[in-house]
From Swiss-Prot:
EC number, as in UniProt: 3.2.1.14
GO molecular function, one term: endochitinase activity
Main EC class the enzyme belongs to: hydrolase
Record bears the keyword Secreted: no
Keyword line: Antimicrobial, Carbohydrate metabolism, Chitin degradation, Disulfide bond, Fungicide, Glycosidase, Hydrolase, Plant defense, Polysaccharide degradation
Reaction catalyzed: Random endo-hydrolysis of N-acetyl-beta-D-glucosaminide (1->4)-beta-linkages in chitin and chitodextrins
Family assignment from sequence similarity: Belongs to the glycosyl hydrolase 19 family. Chitinase class I subfamily.
Biological process annotations from GO: cell wall macromolecule catabolic process; chitin catabolic process; defense response to fungus; killing of cells of another organism; polysaccharide catabolic process
Name of the protein described by the UniProt record: Endochitinase
Purpose of the protein: This protein functions as a defense against chitin-containing fungal pathogens.
Pfam families referenced in this protein's UniProt entry, alphabetically: Glyco_hydro_19
Residues the record marks as active site: 58
InterPro entries in alphabetical order: Glyco_hydro_19, Glyco_hydro_19_cat, Lysozyme-like_dom_sf
Length: 200
């Protein structure tokens, strides 16, 4: 992953990253060997740009007074949205914890107190199909082909389906939404950092 995104580029893309560090991102990515290593260099760069765009939206761009998005960082054991992709609900905490080897059901606050665990949960969500939806990784790397069910649900290849996977119930199918424009804006900004704009 470090061959696709340098520390200086990471810092440029995430100006208000606060708690989220390059070293934690790289350490977490090592647990998901297919992340940013699938396809051509352009595909790998698009994947990093898309991942960081989606996580930037989920954390409100990392504004300094909210390093983990719009949620209070209390020490509760509730399974509310935490981390760069805002995993929620006990079933996601359980599955993510099992995948990364950490008991997040008993220790959900690790998703706000350990920056490597935070990135691991986000990458777990990114790399794992969210049934009946595909993984974001398979979409952005071109490895996914929509089924007739996907097409009927409006899921077709492209950046938009990533939002459907991550937060479709809240943001999709409602016409023009500021949330959607925000996600697209981060993606375009990140692609500019890679000198890959405009993309077809």
């Amino acid at each position: 992953v470090s061959s696709v995104i340098s520390s200086s580029l990471f810092e440029k893309m995430l100006l208000h990253r606060g708690f989220y560090t390059y070293d934690a991102f790289i350490a977490a990515a090592k647990s998901f060997p297919a992340f940013a290593t699938t396809g051509s260099t352009d595909v790998r760069k698009r994947e990093v740009a898309a991942f960081l765009a989606q996580t930037s939206h989920e954390t409100t761009g990392g504004w300094p007074t909210a390093p983990d998005g719009p949620y209070e960082l209390g020490s509760t054991s509730d399974y509310f949205g935490r981390g760069p992709i805002q995993i929620s609900y006990n079933y996601n905490y359980g599955a993510a914890g099992k995948a990364i080897g950490v008991d997040l059901l008993r220790n959900p606050d690790l998703v706000t107190s350990d920056n490597t665990v935070e990135f691991k949960t986000a990458l777990w969500f990114w790399m794992t199909p969210q049934s009946p939806k595909p993984s974001s990784h398979d979409v952005i790397t071109g490895r996914w082909s929509p089924s007739s069910t996907d097409k009927a649900a409006g899921r077709v290849p492209g950046y938009g389906v990533l939002t459907n996977i991550i937060d479709g119930g809240v943001e999709c199918g409602k016409g023009q939404e500021s949330h959607v424009a925000d996600r697209i804006g981060y993606y375009k900004d990140n692609l500019d950092c890679y000198n890959q704009k405009p993309f077809a």
